Amino acid sequence: MGKSNLNLPIQQSTLKVVFSRRMLVAFIMGFSGGLPLLLTWGVLQAWMTEKGVDLTWIGMISLVQIPYTWKFLWAPFLDRFVPPFLGRRRGWLLIAQIALMGAIVGLGYSDPVKNTGLMIGAALLVAFFSATQDIVIDAYRREDLPDEELGLGSSMYVYGYRLGMLLASGGGLILADHLSFPTVYFLMSLCMLPGILTTLLTPEPEVVAGAPRTMKAAVVEPFLDYFSRNGAIWILVFILLYKIGDTMASGITIPFYLETGFSKTEIGTVVKFFGTAATLIGAFAGGVLLLKLGINRGLWIFGILQALSTAGFAILARIGYNISLLSGVIAFENLSSGMGTAAFVAFMASITNKKFTATQYALLTGIMGLSRQLASSVTGLMAKNMGWQSFFVFCTLIAIPGMLLLLKIAPWNSRAADEARAI
């Protein structure tokens, strides 16, 4: 891989890059990637809570997102074979997006109590096709963006991703106060259409290496390439731990808000739509700051802000129902999370080899997903036994190990470290 040039000063050409075709595609593809995630998480948790499902089981529903963790197992297949239409990336992307629309509709026509098996099966299908979409989107973005635009491109992707999440959870919860959940899920499936249109209209990225000639080359060589570099294992451990505190806290917030006394409309309006501005500002600001700071310093600064924002939930748990405090906590959490995720995504993209983009990136994001699923699956049980305030304090402290790994993975001297990471 060539050397990343993410420490360039902000220049007048930045605006031209921001509004380029590549950034628009990264944004829309991010939206398509973020929309399905909370349909099998936050929105589904709200539906289960409304149906009276036990909090422990609500926390464990996050296990249906296992496909996000194991997507590296079928990523080589998407690298090796090329559909007979649209090319290797866009062809697989179109297949995944159409299948995803159908799976979302199917999930809406299940029932958390009467058709539990159907609900779990449909949720697994949504997660599988969503994870497949993510594999192709990540590969497309890495191949489409030059190295010097990875930071800003990653922030635009996060920008769209968070907007998709907010539309699904915030919009979904507000609609659920007035419409049935099956109708809500049907409407959410229609929101996949912009991503499908983008897939049809955007060009296929130009890649010199092309598709692997054999399945052996597609499966074995990406892993040999990755694990041959210095610190490969430490990087995986870092990816597992960096956002674990933020993930644990956000994984059970919907039941927390409901138990604190907030209505679904208040949650949708304040938690989601009020947080939209902070999220979008955070993602965009994170990308622009990465051009100036570099990825390493961004990981340090944004990681500290993430941990502090998690502590805000502990304060809210102690004080109780307070719309103003909720607004402040959510604004801070969304701002810091948007910035931190932009740096995190740019970091993972920067250490992949363009010859093996889909498989290597799927491995890295799979490790990130493993952290999310394992941590989130026990959050309901932990909150039930610890109480909300102690639980959120724990989530704040558990972020420390990941931050300490930055001393090895991403030292503050970002320019030297960024160059050392390039292979």
Question: Predicted regions span which residues?
Answer:
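C-terminal transmembrane helical hairpin of 12-TM major facilitator-type secondary transporters
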Residues: 297-344
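Helix-to-loop junctions at the C-terminal end of transmembrane segments
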Residues: 70-87, 281-298, 383-384
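Glycine-rich segments within core transmembrane alpha-helices of 12-TM secondary carriers
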Residues: 68-71, 151-170, 176, 365-376
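Helix-loop boundary and gating motifs at the non-cytosolic
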Residues: 8-68, 233-238, 242-256, 260, ...
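A late C-terminal transmembrane helix in Major Facilitator Superfamily
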Residues: 355-384
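C-terminal ends and interior cores of transmembrane alpha-helices
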Residues: 93-113, 304-321
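Juxtamembrane intracellular "pre-TM" segments in multi-pass secondary transporters
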Residues: 3-19, 204-235
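Symmetry-related core transmembrane helices of the 12-TM Major Facilitator Superfamily/SLC fold
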Residues: 95-101, 183-200, 390-408
